[in-house]
């Protein structure tokens, strides 16, 4: 069974993007390469159990096991040593990536309080989009009663497009609700 968004991309979006940006080949059409979810857990320095809970929640959200990220440098002000675990990340590709994007756009983002669309300024200049989520409770897999504390996470959508304009059009066609 192929994913609904992937099917839409192949059948509807590719021809529309070729027409809009006058590509000569279908291989020039931008596509989503990967989605990276990152959760920095600053208080993991003092209490390692916080990191375990964050890893568990990120695993539920993404549907695959997160990688624990470690500190690159020691910072005395934060009581941080090089190599200490301070966060978790997940890289989604293929089917899981499309599943997550579908869930993010159609279920999770509409659950954000006072939601007026995501910022259109969060592109990096090379066609990648970054979105900060303030609380993990917007995802349907997270059970409100089992959450010990509210944590945010970063969602980075990496595309093959060369410009922000192309990436924005791609994400808009996928249904990303940009603020007007």
UniProtKB/Swiss-Prot annotation:
InterPro entries, sorted: Ribosomal_uL5, Ribosomal_uL5_bac-type, Ribosomal_uL5_C, Ribosomal_uL5_CS, Ribosomal_uL5_dom_sf, Ribosomal_uL5_N
Disulfide partners:
none
Q: Which UniProt keywords apply?
A: Ribonucleoprotein, Ribosomal protein, RNA-binding, rRNA-binding, tRNA-binding
Query: What is a biological process (GO) this protein takes part in?
Result: translation
Q: Tell me the GO molecular function terms.
A: rRNA binding; structural constituent of ribosome; tRNA binding
Short name of any one Pfam family annotated for the protein:
Ribosomal_L5
Q: Which GO terms describe its cellular component?
A: ribonucleoprotein complex; ribosome
Q: Which PROSITE patterns match?
A: RIBOSOMAL_L5 (PS00358)
NCBIfam families xrefs: PRK00010.1
What is its quaternary makeup? Part of the 50S ribosomal subunit; part of the 5S rRNA/L5/L18/L25 subcomplex. Contacts the 5S rRNA and the P site tRNA. Forms a bridge to the 30S subunit in the 70S ribosome.
Of which family is this protein a member?
Answer: Belongs to the universal ribosomal protein uL5 family.
Q: What does this protein do?
A: This is one of the proteins that bind and probably mediate the attachment of the 5S RNA into the large ribosomal subunit, where it forms part of the central protuberance. In the 70S ribosome it contacts protein S13 of the 30S subunit (bridge B1b), connecting the 2 subunits; this bridge is implicated in subunit movement. Contacts the P site tRNA; the 5S rRNA and some of its associated proteins might help stabilize positioning of ribosome-bound tRNAs.
Please report the name of this protein according to its UniProt entry: Large ribosomal subunit protein uL5
Q: Which gene encodes it?
A: rplE
